[in-house]
Amino acid sequence: MRDPAPSDTSKKRVIVGMSGGVDSSVSALLLIEQGYEVEGLFMKNWEEDDGTEYCTAMDDLADAQAVCDKIGIKLHTANFAAEYWDNVFEHFLAEYKAGRTPNPDILCNREIKFKAFLDYAMMLGADLIATGHYVRRRDIDGRTELLKGLDPNKDQSYFLHAVGGEQIAKTLFPVGELEKPEVRAIAEKYELATAKKKDSTGICFIGERRFSDFLKQYLPAQPGEIKTTEGEVIGRHHGLMYHTIGQRQGLGIGGLKDAGDEPWYVLRKDLDTNELIVGQGNNHPWLFSSALLASEIYWVNPIDLSQPLRLTAKVRYRQSDQACTLEKTDTGYRAVFDEPQRAVTPGQSVVFYDGEICLGGGVIEVAEPWSGQA
């Protein structure tokens, strides 16, 4: 079953967010097949730097245009770089400056794709927008629910949890009912230019650059000490912002006497002392948390939290659903997990589910230590 198409689809004008990737390309094609009046829109959300780094935006625009030409639809372009800088990138920098690890894709969806793009599309006369996200929607009892995508390997509801039901109600997700290989097969069948194009990975405005090189353009590095849980200094870091909880690579620790062969992991970031706390072993007790505190909660639809709720949650993308109890506190929300969770990271998002329904989520403020810690 695909996104329900109303009987008068020919009267419905849909503008598809065309990224230059295969998912949005096939989304536009499927909507044409369903009888909608379809147009595309390519968003430029970042002004590339003046320098040697090459931004892929021009390639993506060319691919989007090639697909639109092939399937016979108009392609609009819009520049949301100012909105992106103000509403996404400045927050991204502020979070890293505060020693946290943000997820700009979630803010981008809320502020750009389902706000700036949605408003722009409506200004162009659209009835609906569409994107190539692997999620589904369901209209029930006067509200619109956000559901997980049918392909568990590609489900993107984690990234859309902060988008409200009113925005979801104005959006179609044509590939949400499909698995990725099916989408590729459709693109190849119709000989779309994006059929074999690799999926984009990483943060859009960084591209192929090293993350540390990009970040130091905007934030001054503050080197400090690397310490063990016992307080022994075993190295120096270039800045807490370059490290995240659970990180193994790039610590520059090695050859320590009596340290053994187990790899080192980031366990804590002490902002007061600018120290990076590390320990050995993939299952070091300090890596685990029994609960978390969250703020900046966004619900797709209002929910009743007058009593604690039994739900499932994800503390990172593609994590399997984790059983928890969610309750409202005086300062935010607290989720207590049935099983200890590894590498719960402040600044990242926790997203709550009721079965296949994505309820919403928020920003992790505090990871409460597991009682198994020494």
UniProtKB/Swiss-Prot annotation:
Site note Interaction with tRNA, residues: 133, 348
One GO biological process term: tRNA wobble position uridine thiolation
Annotated localization: Cytoplasm
Gene3D superfamilies with a match to the protein in the record: Adenine nucleotide alpha hydrolases-like domains, HUPs, Translation factors
Active site residues of this protein: 108 (nucleophile), 204 (cysteine persulfide intermediate)
Region (Interaction with target base in tRNA): 103-105
MF (Gene Ontology): ATP binding; tRNA binding; tRNA-uridine 2-sulfurtransferase activity
Keywords: ATP-binding, Cytoplasm, Disulfide bond, Nucleotide-binding, RNA-binding, Transferase, tRNA processing, tRNA-binding
Annotated GO CC locations: cytoplasm
Enzyme Commission (EC) number: 2.8.1.13
Residues that, per the record, bind ATP: 17-24, 43, 132
Known catalytic reactions: S-sulfanyl-L-cysteinyl-[protein] + uridine(34) in tRNA + AH2 + ATP = 2-thiouridine(34) in tRNA + L-cysteinyl-[protein] + A + AMP + diphosphate + H(+)
Disulphides: 108-204
Keyword Cell inner membrane part of the UniProt annotation: no
Region span, Interaction with tRNA: 154-156, 316-317
NCBIfam families recorded: PRK00143.1, trmU
Family the UniProt entry places it in: Belongs to the MnmA/TRMU family.
Family matches, as HAMAP family: tRNA_thiouridyl_MnmA
Functional note: Catalyzes the 2-thiolation of uridine at the wobble position (U34) of tRNA, leading to the formation of s(2)U34.
Protein's UniProt name: tRNA-specific 2-thiouridylase MnmA
Species, as recorded: Pseudomonas fluorescens (strain Pf0-1)
